[in-house]
Amino acid sequence: MSIEVIFALNDNPSVLPPTEGFHYVDQGNYQTFELRQGQPLICYSDSATSCIITAVVASHGARTTVTLAHLDSPACISSFFDIVAAQAADSYRIYAQGANPPDNDTSKQNAAQLQTCVDNLGGKVTTAELSLLQGDPREHNRGEFGLAFDGGNLAVAGNQPFTLQLFQRDPSCGGQTVYCIMRRQEQPPRQIRDAALPFTHQELVELSSIALQFRKDASDPGSAFTNIVNLESEEIRQNWSTTPAYEAPWFSDQLKLGAAFAIAMAPVVSLSELHLRKTTPPSFARLRKVLLSR
């Protein structure tokens, strides 16, 4: 099936998402969708400042897929493109927006890493349209990006914004937010995950355990992740964002949701850690610790 992809950026106002065929991919995640005749879909992400939202349209013989990712660091970008390369597609068309504002160091590093990864795919890349380092992420819908497929032979890679509620961004009631913030505190650090896979009980327990103990400054109780529930929105942006002046309006509320989730998980963490140690095989993290201690 031959699908034409148009790269189209706009200043359109936000609209409600369709009730069917709409898929949101949050920060630190990717998800792959097959584009099938008669099945329209939209895959979408938002809130990007220094992050880069990337859509990779891959051709596999008669099949076409799109993989959407919200990438937030050079290591995350590199890990994602390892996954893309492993798909062993016949060709790739790559579209992206983000890495703003352009004078931010993280934005510059992310943009450079994305370009390197695209170049490393070599001749298989037939199209690369990358809108990076363009300006204020709050303007011209620069923080939004996705791909809309009409169910026929046309897809639009663009930045039409959608009006979403917190439960649509984080259906796990805060677990995704805890993952996003705490995943690099895991050993080894986790760069990216497949959003099509639900979190397991053990994953949420381990992430919540980290979140309950985490402080940005070990000597300052006020810097604890769980203390976010006591902070005003401006304090959250200043303390927990690398681009505090540019964050989306829902940034602070989403972090509060994650902190509340971790607090609510505290008794589950205590019970589960005891239960898991006694009745189930250790996680890879625990197994690694045992092996390295010998």
Which residues make up each language-model segment?
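C-terminal functional modules of predominantly eukaryotic multidomain proteins
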Residues: 2-26, 31, 104-294
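Gly/Ser/Thr-rich loops at beta-strand to alpha-helix junctions
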Residues: 47-51, 100-107
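Short glycine-rich phosphate-binding loop at a beta-alpha junction
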Residues: 90-99
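Acidic, glycine-rich active-site loops and adjacent beta-strand->loop/helix elements
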Residues: 71-74, 98-102
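Short beta-strand segments
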Residues: 55-57, 97-98, 148-150
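Conserved mixed alpha/beta catalytic, RNA-binding, or beta-rich assembly cores of soluble enzyme
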Residues: 36-88
